[in-house]
């Protein structure tokens, strides 16, 4: 299928073709990838908790030290186009996952509607509903599961 040249970049480019600016813009700012996750040892399912990384702002869902996040949080996961086949653990609403699956961005995505607050207003993010990592003992994370990655 031929896609018009004036189509949005995420519809006419693969993830590997995106510029660094386009790649960053694809992030909807939901912060879900920065929530602590647990993996079921029996079936390898990934479960999201409402426990946020220590660097995640609980209201804006933005990293408080994005440029230095890998030094501050050694197990912080860097999303890159080359890892698109591993994006299944990302939420089904994630722009990176959607584009990697050949799907369009939802109407609430800031690149579609022009409003970065829609991700929060539509309750896609966990803004205002997360717990700080330092406030919950790791043994208690199971008590705070919110959904299973599909």
UniProtKB/Swiss-Prot annotation:
InterPro entries with a match to the protein in the record: Puta_zinc/iron-chelating_dom, UCP006173
NCBIfam families linked: PRK05170.1-5, PRK05170.1-6, PRK05170.2-5
Family, per entry: Belongs to the UPF0260 family.
This protein's name: UPF0260 protein PputGB1_4117
Species this protein is from: Pseudomonas putida (strain GB-1)
